[in-house]
């Protein structure tokens, strides 16, 4: 896998968005002509190594769209966007979830998946797990199965994996 290359293209930005936070910036990875492709290929290899065989990919707004579409293309699968409220034109399911300061919601079309689908959730970052768990809850409202979740990065020590206990969770890089 290209993990050293991928990690080298993620910039560490201290004190952003506030003092004491080390922000992991993926824009240099995306700006590299090979960055997105190598990341999607590494994700596909991780899935193969774990025996995960999804039938469709779901990506959480907004950076999950970038990596999710790229991975879906590598896997030859379709892609479903998990959106912020009010962005989808047809009937939706919605899940509200808590943030550090307040709450937010995510939505998907009610007919986004078939009950036989094995859905792979893709996002750039696993931190506390709140957004990922809300995405899982949405998928399960459709009666589809969650095949697994894959992230480009995981921040250790923030309990994201514990929130997703019982699901197959992978991350390419841990910080």
UniProtKB/Swiss-Prot annotation:
Uppermost EC category: transferase
InterPro entries: Ade_phspho_trans (IPR005764), PRibTrfase_dom (IPR000836), PRTase-like (IPR029057), UPRTase/APRTase (IPR050054)
Major location (coarse): cytoplasm
GO CC term (a single one): cytoplasm
Listed Gene3D superfamilies: 3.40.50.2020
Top-rank taxon, per record: Bacteria
Subcellular location: Cytoplasm
Molecular function terms, GO-annotated: adenine binding; adenine phosphoribosyltransferase activity; AMP binding
Catalytic reactions on record: AMP + diphosphate = 5-phospho-alpha-D-ribose 1-diphosphate + adenine
Role, per record: Catalyzes a salvage reaction resulting in the formation of AMP, that is energically less costly than de novo synthesis.
Name of the molecule in the record: Adenine phosphoribosyltransferase
Protein's organism: Francisella tularensis subsp. tularensis (strain WY96-3418)
């Amino acid at each position: 896998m290209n993990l050293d290359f991928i990690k080298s293209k993620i910039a560490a930005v201290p004190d952003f968005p506030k003092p004491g936070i080390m922000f992991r910036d993926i824009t240099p990875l995306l700006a590299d002509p090979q960055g997105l492709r190598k990341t999607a290929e590494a994700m596909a290899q991780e899935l193969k190594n774990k025996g995960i065989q999804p039938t469709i990919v779901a990506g959480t707004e907004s950076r999950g769209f970038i990596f999710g579409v790229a991975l879906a293309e590598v896997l030859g699968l379709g892609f479903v966007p998990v959106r912020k409220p009010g962005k989808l034109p047809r009937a939706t399911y919605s899940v509200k979830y808590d943030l550090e300061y307040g709450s937010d919601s995510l939505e998907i079309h009610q007919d986004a998946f078939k009950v036989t689908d094995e859905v792979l959730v893709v996002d750039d970052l696993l931190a506390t797990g709140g957004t990922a768990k809300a995405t899982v809850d949405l998928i399960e409202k459709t009666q589809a199965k969650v095949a697994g979740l894959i992230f480009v990065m995981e921040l250790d020590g923030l309990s994201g994996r514990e929130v997703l206990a019982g699901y197959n969770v992978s991350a390419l890089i841990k910080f």
